[in-house]
A protein has these predicted regions:
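Phosphate-coordination/substrate-recognition cap region in phosphate-metabolizing enzymes
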Residues: 3-5, 42-110
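Short beta-strand scaffold positions
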Residues: 58-59, 132, 153-154
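Beta-strand elements within well-structured catalytic alpha/beta cores of enzymes
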Residues: 4-9, 148-154, 158
Length: 212
C-alpha cells in the first residue's frame, strides 16, 4: 500500500509571538500575521512550490488560515478548516508571560511545570487533551489520502503534541520539541503507522527575524 505524506507546519509570526518577554497565545487570541509573519509565509510558499499537494487543511485561527492560503498559492485547492487543529486553550494564562503566571498563579504554575503533559494550563487544556482531539483526525486524513501528499497548518502546542506521540516521547517532553514559526515537519504514514522524516525544518525563514 502506498504511503501518505503529511506536511505539518506552524503558522507564521504574529504580534504576540514577537512580544518580549514571551507571552502565551492560545485559542482565544485570533490576530493576523505580522509583517514579518507574512514574509515567513511567502518564504514557506516558495519552498513548497513544487510539492504536489492533494489537499490542504488548517486550524480555524486566522494566523493559520493566512499561512495556509499563502502556502497553497495558485494551486486549484480549497482550504479545508479543521477545528481539531486549533491551538491549545491556555485558559486564564492567555497573553501572560511566565513571570506573570508564576507570580499570579504560583501553585497552579508549579503543578503545570512539574508535569506539563497531563496537568492543563489553568482553566484550559493539557497536552494530552490536545493529543486526544488531534491524533484521531490526523490518522483519518492519512488513510483518506493514501498515496497522496497533504498539507496541514497548525500551531506550536498542537504540532508538539502530535510529534511527541509519533516519536513515542513521554508527553511531558513534548514541550522540548521546538517549532519555529512557519517551520515544516514531514510525516510519512505507512501501513505500519507514522514516521517522522523531517522535524522543524526552518532554513527557508532563517534569514528573517526569529521569534518563539
Amino acid at each position: 500500500m502506498p504511503d501518505t505524506i503529511i506536511y505539518l507546519m506552524r503558522h507564521g509570526e504574529t504580534a504576540e509571538n514577537a512580544c518580549r518577554p514571551f507571552i502565551l497565545q492560545g485559542n482565544s487570541v485570533n490576530g493576523p500575521l505580522s509583517e514579518n509573519g507574512r514574509r515567513q509565509a511567502a518564504a514557506l510558499a516558495t519552498l513548497l512550490e513544487s510539492v504536489p499537494f492533494k489537499a490542504f487543511f488548517a486550524s480555524p485561527m486566522l494566523r493559520a488560515q493566512q499561512t495556509a492560503q499563502a502556502a497553497i498559492g495558485p494551486r486549484p485547492l480549497t482550504l479545508e478548516t479543521m477545528k481539531a487543529f486549533e491551538e491549545v486553550n491556555v485558559g486564564q494564562w492567555e497573553r501572560l508571560s511566565w513571570n506573570q503566571i508564576k507570580e499570579q498563579y504560583p501553585r497552579e504554575s508549579a503543578e503545570f511545570l512539574a508535569n506539563p503533559g497531563t496537568v492543563p494550563y489553568y482553566g484550559g487544556e493539557s497536552y494530552v487533551d490536545v493529543q486526544k482531539r488531534t491524533l484521531p483526525v490526523l490518522e483519518d486524513l492519512a488513510w483518506k489520502y493514501v498515496g497522496h501528499t497533504i498539507g496541514i497548518v497548525a500551531h506550536n502546542v498542537v504540532n508538539k503534541s502530535i510529534l511527541a506521540s509519533i516519536l513515542q516521547l513521554p508527553i511531558a517532553r513534548a514541550r522540548t520539541l521546538h517549532q519555529t514559526n512557519c517551520c515544516v515537519n514531514i510525516i510519512r504514514w505507512t501501513e505500519n503507522g507514522p514516521e517522522v522524516e523531517v522535524l522543524n525544518s526552518d532554513l527557508h525563514v532563517r534569514h528573517l527575524p526569529q521569534t518563539l
